[in-house]
Protein backbone atom coordinates (compact mmCIF):
# COMPACT_ATOMS: atom_id res chain seq x y z
CA UNK A 1 0.00 0.00 0.00
CA UNK A 2 1.15 3.54 -0.72
CA UNK A 3 0.88 6.57 1.53
CA UNK A 4 -2.45 7.96 2.65
CA UNK A 5 -2.40 10.64 -0.04
CA UNK A 6 -2.15 7.98 -2.75
CA UNK A 7 -4.65 5.59 -1.24
CA UNK A 8 -7.65 6.17 -3.46
CA UNK A 9 -5.67 6.02 -6.70
CA UNK A 10 -6.04 2.26 -6.66
CA UNK A 11 -9.69 1.89 -5.70
CA UNK A 12 -11.21 2.22 -9.15
CA UNK A 13 -8.91 -0.41 -10.56
CA UNK A 14 -9.58 -2.96 -7.82
CA UNK A 15 -11.69 -5.84 -9.10
CA UNK A 16 -13.81 -7.90 -6.75
CA UNK A 17 -13.45 -11.59 -7.48
CA UNK A 18 -16.91 -12.93 -6.85
CA UNK A 19 -17.59 -16.21 -8.60
CA UNK A 20 -15.57 -19.38 -9.12
CA UNK A 21 -14.81 -20.69 -12.59
CA UNK A 22 -14.92 -24.47 -12.58
CA UNK A 23 -13.55 -26.03 -15.74
CA UNK A 24 -13.11 -29.46 -14.19
CA UNK A 25 -15.97 -31.18 -16.04
CA UNK A 26 -15.47 -29.32 -19.31
CA UNK A 27 -11.76 -30.05 -19.43
CA UNK A 28 -11.78 -33.55 -17.92
CA UNK A 29 -11.39 -35.17 -21.36
CA UNK A 30 -8.98 -32.61 -22.80
CA UNK A 31 -5.75 -33.87 -24.37
CA UNK A 32 -2.56 -33.94 -22.34
CA UNK A 33 -1.46 -30.41 -23.11
CA UNK A 34 1.88 -30.95 -21.45
CA UNK A 35 2.89 -33.38 -24.22
CA UNK A 36 5.92 -31.66 -25.77
CA UNK A 37 5.70 -30.07 -29.20
CA UNK A 38 2.18 -31.28 -30.03
CA UNK A 39 -0.98 -29.30 -30.68
CA UNK A 40 -4.34 -29.95 -29.09
CA UNK A 41 -5.33 -32.30 -31.93
CA UNK A 42 -2.13 -34.33 -31.66
CA UNK A 43 -0.26 -32.77 -34.59
CA UNK A 44 3.39 -31.85 -34.17
CA UNK A 45 4.30 -28.21 -33.93
CA UNK A 46 6.55 -26.86 -36.66
CA UNK A 47 10.01 -26.34 -35.23
CA UNK A 48 10.84 -22.64 -35.03
CA UNK A 49 13.89 -20.88 -33.66
CA UNK A 50 13.90 -17.44 -32.10
CA UNK A 51 15.89 -15.43 -29.57
CA UNK A 52 13.26 -15.38 -26.82
CA UNK A 53 12.34 -18.07 -24.33
CA UNK A 54 9.56 -17.75 -21.78
CA UNK A 55 7.91 -19.65 -18.97
CA UNK A 56 5.01 -19.25 -16.59
CA UNK A 57 5.65 -17.38 -13.35
CA UNK A 58 4.16 -19.43 -10.51
CA UNK A 59 2.52 -22.81 -10.11
CA UNK A 60 -0.42 -22.42 -12.48
CA UNK A 61 -3.06 -20.29 -14.20
CA UNK A 62 -6.33 -19.90 -12.32
CA UNK A 63 -9.43 -18.44 -14.03
CA UNK A 64 -11.95 -16.52 -11.96
CA UNK A 65 -15.08 -14.51 -12.66
CA UNK A 66 -14.98 -10.89 -11.54
CA UNK A 67 -17.53 -8.32 -10.48
CA UNK A 68 -17.45 -6.96 -14.05
CA UNK A 69 -19.13 -10.18 -15.19
CA UNK A 70 -16.12 -11.34 -17.20
CA UNK A 71 -14.04 -14.45 -16.66
CA UNK A 72 -10.41 -13.42 -16.07
CA UNK A 73 -7.29 -15.47 -16.75
CA UNK A 74 -4.56 -13.43 -15.05
CA UNK A 75 -0.97 -14.64 -15.16
CA UNK A 76 2.62 -13.57 -15.82
CA UNK A 77 5.41 -14.92 -18.03
CA UNK A 78 9.14 -14.44 -17.60
CA UNK A 79 10.81 -13.63 -20.94
CA UNK A 80 14.56 -14.00 -21.56
CA UNK A 81 16.57 -13.06 -24.63
CA UNK A 82 18.84 -16.10 -24.89
CA UNK A 83 21.00 -14.60 -27.64
CA UNK A 84 23.62 -11.85 -27.55
CA UNK A 85 21.83 -9.34 -29.81
CA UNK A 86 18.84 -7.18 -28.86
CA UNK A 87 15.39 -8.44 -29.87
CA UNK A 88 12.14 -6.51 -30.24
CA UNK A 89 8.73 -8.04 -29.58
CA UNK A 90 6.37 -6.99 -32.37
CA UNK A 91 3.29 -8.84 -31.14
CA UNK A 92 2.14 -11.39 -28.58
CA UNK A 93 -1.04 -13.40 -29.05
CA UNK A 94 -2.69 -15.76 -26.59
CA UNK A 95 -3.91 -18.73 -28.65
CA UNK A 96 -5.94 -21.88 -28.06
CA UNK A 97 -3.98 -25.01 -29.04
CA UNK A 98 -7.19 -27.05 -29.20
CA UNK A 99 -8.48 -24.67 -31.91
CA UNK A 100 -5.43 -24.82 -34.19
CA UNK A 101 -3.82 -21.91 -32.34
CA UNK A 102 -6.55 -19.40 -33.02
CA UNK A 103 -6.40 -16.27 -30.84
CA UNK A 104 -8.46 -16.61 -27.68
CA UNK A 105 -9.94 -14.04 -25.31
CA UNK A 106 -9.12 -10.34 -25.03
CA UNK A 107 -5.80 -9.51 -23.41
CA UNK A 108 -5.23 -6.04 -21.94
CA UNK A 109 -3.25 -4.73 -18.98
CA UNK A 110 -2.51 -1.19 -17.80
CA UNK A 111 -0.10 0.52 -15.42
CA UNK A 112 -1.22 2.39 -12.31
CA UNK A 113 -1.19 5.54 -14.47
CA UNK A 114 -3.67 3.98 -16.91
CA UNK A 115 -0.95 3.42 -19.53
CA UNK A 116 -1.35 0.46 -21.87
CA UNK A 117 1.43 -2.04 -21.14
CA UNK A 118 -0.09 -4.99 -23.01
CA UNK A 119 2.60 -7.10 -24.69
CA UNK A 120 5.44 -5.21 -22.99
CA UNK A 121 8.07 -6.68 -20.69
CA UNK A 122 8.87 -5.24 -17.26
CA UNK A 123 12.64 -5.35 -17.65
CA UNK A 124 14.80 -6.47 -14.75
CA UNK A 125 17.43 -3.85 -15.63
CA UNK A 126 15.07 -0.86 -15.35
CA UNK A 127 14.02 0.91 -12.19
CA UNK A 128 11.29 -0.95 -10.35
CA UNK A 129 8.34 1.37 -10.76
CA UNK A 130 4.74 0.60 -11.63
CA UNK A 131 4.46 3.06 -14.52
CA UNK A 132 5.25 2.45 -18.18
CA UNK A 133 8.87 3.55 -17.73
CA UNK A 134 9.62 0.05 -16.38
CA UNK A 135 8.36 -1.67 -19.53
CA UNK A 136 9.73 -2.17 -23.03
CA UNK A 137 9.21 -4.23 -26.17
CA UNK A 138 13.00 -4.35 -26.70
CA UNK A 139 15.02 -6.90 -24.74
CA UNK A 140 18.81 -6.68 -24.78
CA UNK A 141 20.92 -9.77 -25.29
CA UNK A 142 20.91 -11.88 -22.14
CA UNK A 143 18.28 -9.70 -20.46
CA UNK A 144 15.02 -10.88 -18.93
CA UNK A 145 11.82 -9.49 -17.53
CA UNK A 146 8.16 -10.22 -16.84
CA UNK A 147 5.13 -9.79 -19.10
CA UNK A 148 1.69 -9.59 -17.50
CA UNK A 149 -1.59 -10.86 -18.93
CA UNK A 150 -5.27 -10.40 -18.16
CA UNK A 151 -7.15 -12.45 -20.75
CA UNK A 152 -10.90 -11.96 -20.43
CA UNK A 153 -13.88 -13.92 -21.72
CA UNK A 154 -17.62 -13.12 -21.76
CA UNK A 155 -18.48 -16.42 -20.05
CA UNK A 156 -16.66 -18.89 -17.85
CA UNK A 157 -17.27 -21.68 -20.36
CA UNK A 158 -15.29 -19.72 -22.95
CA UNK A 159 -12.02 -20.11 -21.03
CA UNK A 160 -9.89 -22.71 -22.86
CA UNK A 161 -8.44 -25.76 -21.16
CA UNK A 162 -4.94 -24.69 -22.22
CA UNK A 163 -3.24 -21.72 -23.85
CA UNK A 164 -0.09 -21.04 -25.86
CA UNK A 165 1.66 -17.82 -26.84
CA UNK A 166 2.47 -16.79 -30.40
CA UNK A 167 5.34 -14.30 -30.23
CA UNK A 168 6.56 -12.35 -33.27
CA UNK A 169 10.09 -11.02 -32.79
CA UNK A 170 12.48 -8.99 -34.93
CA UNK A 171 16.25 -8.85 -34.56
CA UNK A 172 17.65 -6.59 -37.32
CA UNK A 173 21.26 -7.07 -36.22
CA UNK A 174 20.95 -10.81 -36.73
CA UNK A 175 21.61 -11.30 -40.45
CA UNK A 176 20.84 -15.03 -40.38
CA UNK A 177 17.48 -14.77 -38.57
CA UNK A 178 16.20 -11.17 -38.54
CA UNK A 179 12.60 -12.22 -37.83
CA UNK A 180 10.83 -15.09 -36.07
CA UNK A 181 7.31 -16.14 -35.07
CA UNK A 182 7.26 -18.81 -32.36
CA UNK A 183 4.30 -20.66 -30.83
CA UNK A 184 5.12 -22.10 -27.41
CA UNK A 185 4.05 -25.55 -26.20
CA UNK A 186 0.65 -25.43 -24.46
CA UNK A 187 0.15 -24.79 -20.77
CA UNK A 188 -2.85 -26.15 -18.93
CA UNK A 189 -5.36 -23.78 -17.38
CA UNK A 190 -6.24 -24.94 -13.87
CA UNK A 191 -9.62 -26.62 -13.45
CA UNK A 192 -9.59 -25.79 -9.73
CA UNK A 193 -12.60 -23.68 -8.77
CA UNK A 194 -11.97 -20.46 -6.86
CA UNK A 195 -12.78 -20.81 -3.19
CA UNK A 196 -15.90 -19.09 -1.81
CA UNK A 197 -15.32 -17.39 1.55
CA UNK A 198 -17.14 -15.51 4.29
CA UNK A 199 -16.06 -11.87 4.80
CA UNK A 200 -13.03 -11.31 7.07
CA UNK A 201 -14.78 -8.48 8.97
CA UNK A 202 -18.20 -7.06 9.83
CA UNK A 203 -19.88 -3.80 8.95
CA UNK A 204 -20.17 -1.49 5.97
CA UNK A 205 -17.81 0.87 4.15
CA UNK A 206 -15.18 -1.72 3.24
CA UNK A 207 -13.54 -1.40 -0.17
CA UNK A 208 -11.03 -3.59 -1.96
CA UNK A 209 -7.91 -1.70 -3.01
CA UNK A 210 -5.13 -3.00 -5.23
CA UNK A 211 -7.22 -5.88 -6.54
CA UNK A 212 -6.73 -8.08 -9.59
CA UNK A 213 -6.65 -8.05 -12.65
CA UNK A 214 -6.51 -5.32 -15.34
CA UNK A 215 -4.17 -2.97 -13.51
CA UNK A 216 -0.60 -4.05 -12.79
CA UNK A 217 -0.61 -2.38 -9.39
CA UNK A 218 1.11 -3.06 -6.06
CA UNK A 219 0.00 -6.70 -5.91
CA UNK A 220 0.05 -7.94 -9.51
CA UNK A 221 3.38 -6.14 -10.03
CA UNK A 222 5.08 -8.30 -7.41
CA UNK A 223 7.12 -11.26 -8.68
CA UNK A 224 9.46 -12.22 -5.88
CA UNK A 225 12.71 -14.13 -6.56
CA UNK A 226 12.46 -16.60 -3.67
CA UNK A 227 14.43 -19.85 -3.33
CA UNK A 228 15.56 -19.68 -6.94
CA UNK A 229 12.16 -19.11 -8.58
CA UNK A 230 9.92 -16.16 -9.40
CA UNK A 231 6.58 -16.26 -7.62
CA UNK A 232 3.42 -14.19 -8.28
CA UNK A 233 2.95 -14.16 -4.54
CA UNK A 234 0.31 -11.42 -4.35
CA UNK A 235 -1.46 -11.51 -7.73
CA UNK A 236 -4.94 -12.04 -6.23
CA UNK A 237 -4.31 -10.30 -2.89
CA UNK A 238 -6.56 -7.48 -1.71
CA UNK A 239 -5.89 -4.55 0.62
CA UNK A 240 -9.13 -4.05 2.53
CA UNK A 241 -9.72 -0.56 3.91
CA UNK A 242 -12.73 1.28 5.28
CA UNK A 243 -13.99 4.63 4.00
CA UNK A 244 -16.79 6.98 4.99
CA UNK A 245 -19.54 8.46 2.82
CA UNK A 246 -17.09 11.14 1.62
CA UNK A 247 -14.55 8.57 0.47
CA UNK A 248 -12.08 9.34 3.29
CA UNK A 249 -10.16 6.56 5.00
CA UNK A 250 -9.33 8.50 8.19
CA UNK A 251 -11.05 10.90 10.58
CA UNK A 252 -8.62 13.85 10.51
CA UNK A 253 -5.15 13.74 8.93
CA UNK A 254 -4.32 10.01 9.00
CA UNK A 255 -0.99 10.59 10.74
CA UNK A 256 -1.61 7.98 13.43
CA UNK A 257 -2.88 4.43 12.95
CA UNK A 258 -5.78 5.06 15.33
CA UNK A 259 -7.07 7.88 13.10
CA UNK A 260 -7.89 5.43 10.32
CA UNK A 261 -11.45 4.15 10.18
CA UNK A 262 -10.39 0.54 9.70
CA UNK A 263 -7.85 0.46 12.53
CA UNK A 264 -8.80 -1.91 15.34
CA UNK A 265 -11.54 -3.68 13.38
CA UNK A 266 -12.12 -7.30 14.39
CA UNK A 267 -10.75 -9.77 11.85
CA UNK A 268 -12.69 -12.98 11.39
CA UNK A 269 -11.99 -16.44 10.02
CA UNK A 270 -13.31 -16.68 6.45
CA UNK A 271 -13.76 -20.47 6.63
CA UNK A 272 -13.10 -23.40 8.95
CA UNK A 273 -9.40 -24.10 9.27
CA UNK A 274 -6.33 -24.69 11.39
CA UNK A 275 -3.95 -21.95 12.54
CA UNK A 276 -0.49 -22.80 11.15
CA UNK A 277 1.44 -19.55 11.61
CA UNK A 278 1.19 -16.56 13.94
CA UNK A 279 3.19 -13.39 14.60
CA UNK A 280 1.83 -11.03 17.25
CA UNK A 281 4.41 -8.68 18.83
CA UNK A 282 5.62 -6.31 16.09
CA UNK A 283 4.87 -2.58 16.57
CA UNK A 284 2.62 -0.53 14.32
CA UNK A 285 4.31 1.62 11.67
CA UNK A 286 3.80 5.37 11.33
CA UNK A 287 1.36 5.99 8.44
CA UNK A 288 2.99 7.58 5.41
CA UNK A 289 6.53 6.51 6.34
CA UNK A 290 8.36 3.71 4.53
CA UNK A 291 9.28 0.99 7.07
CA UNK A 292 12.99 0.39 7.59
CA UNK A 293 15.13 -2.53 8.76
CA UNK A 294 12.45 -5.19 8.41
CA UNK A 295 13.52 -8.79 8.01
CA UNK A 296 11.84 -10.89 5.32
CA UNK A 297 9.86 -12.67 8.03
CA UNK A 298 8.57 -9.31 9.33
CA UNK A 299 7.19 -8.07 5.99
CA UNK A 300 3.62 -9.30 6.67
CA UNK A 301 3.78 -7.81 10.15
CA UNK A 302 1.64 -9.38 12.83
CA UNK A 303 -0.31 -12.01 10.98
CA UNK A 304 -2.35 -15.19 11.10
CA UNK A 305 -2.22 -17.99 8.53
CA UNK A 306 -5.06 -20.52 8.33
CA UNK A 307 -4.81 -23.88 6.59
CA UNK A 308 -8.19 -24.20 4.85
CA UNK A 309 -7.40 -27.61 3.35
CA UNK A 310 -7.04 -28.57 -0.28
CA UNK A 311 -3.74 -26.73 -0.65
CA UNK A 312 -5.21 -23.34 0.26
CA UNK A 313 -4.03 -20.99 3.00
CA UNK A 314 -5.72 -17.77 4.14
CA UNK A 315 -3.28 -15.05 5.22
CA UNK A 316 -4.20 -11.97 7.30
CA UNK A 317 -1.32 -9.46 7.37
CA UNK A 318 -0.50 -6.16 9.16
CA UNK A 319 -2.52 -6.86 12.33
CA UNK A 320 -2.31 -4.65 15.42
CA UNK A 321 0.34 -5.54 18.04
CA UNK A 322 -0.60 -7.90 20.87
CA UNK A 323 -4.14 -8.44 19.53
CA UNK A 324 -3.86 -11.86 17.88
CA UNK A 325 -6.19 -14.16 19.83
CA UNK A 326 -5.30 -17.55 18.32
CA UNK A 327 -2.32 -19.88 18.53
CA UNK A 328 -0.68 -22.38 16.20
CA UNK A 329 -2.71 -25.58 16.19
CA UNK A 330 -6.03 -23.94 17.06
CA UNK A 331 -9.06 -25.01 15.03
CA UNK A 332 -11.34 -22.13 14.03
CA UNK A 333 -14.80 -21.87 12.51
CA UNK A 334 -15.98 -19.28 10.00
CA UNK A 335 -16.64 -16.05 11.87
CA UNK A 336 -14.29 -16.74 14.79
CA UNK A 337 -12.24 -13.73 15.92
CA UNK A 338 -8.54 -13.85 15.02
CA UNK A 339 -7.38 -10.42 16.18
CA UNK A 340 -7.54 -6.73 15.23
CA UNK A 341 -6.59 -4.82 12.09
CA UNK A 342 -3.41 -2.77 12.45
CA UNK A 343 -0.43 -1.26 10.64
CA UNK A 344 2.51 -3.55 11.37
CA UNK A 345 5.12 -4.82 8.93
CA UNK A 346 5.72 -3.54 5.39
CA UNK A 347 2.88 -1.03 5.21
CA UNK A 348 2.42 2.74 5.05
CA UNK A 349 -1.23 2.87 6.15
CA UNK A 350 -3.63 0.67 8.16
CA UNK A 351 -5.38 -2.00 6.09
CA UNK A 352 -5.96 -5.72 6.00
CA UNK A 353 -3.77 -7.41 3.43
CA UNK A 354 -5.70 -10.61 2.72
CA UNK A 355 -4.87 -13.38 0.30
CA UNK A 356 -5.30 -17.05 -0.45
CA UNK A 357 -2.03 -18.86 -1.19
CA UNK A 358 -0.96 -22.33 -2.25
CA UNK A 359 1.64 -22.37 0.55
CA UNK A 360 1.68 -20.84 4.06
CA UNK A 361 3.77 -17.83 2.99
CA UNK A 362 3.28 -14.34 1.60
CA UNK A 363 6.51 -14.57 -0.43
CA UNK A 364 7.30 -18.17 -1.42
CA UNK A 365 3.88 -18.87 -2.91
CA UNK A 366 1.49 -18.48 -5.81
CA UNK A 367 -1.55 -16.43 -4.81
CA UNK A 368 -4.89 -18.06 -5.65
CA UNK A 369 -8.33 -16.58 -6.41
Protein language model annotation of sequence segments:
Residues 78-86, 96:
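Asparagine-centered strand-capping/turn motif at beta-strand->loop junctions
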Residues 107-157:
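Intrinsically disordered, low-complexity Pro/Gly/Ser/Thr-rich segments with frequent PxxP/GP/PP motifs
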Residues 273-275, 329-341:
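A structural signal for short beta-strand/turn segments enriched in small hydrophobics and glycine
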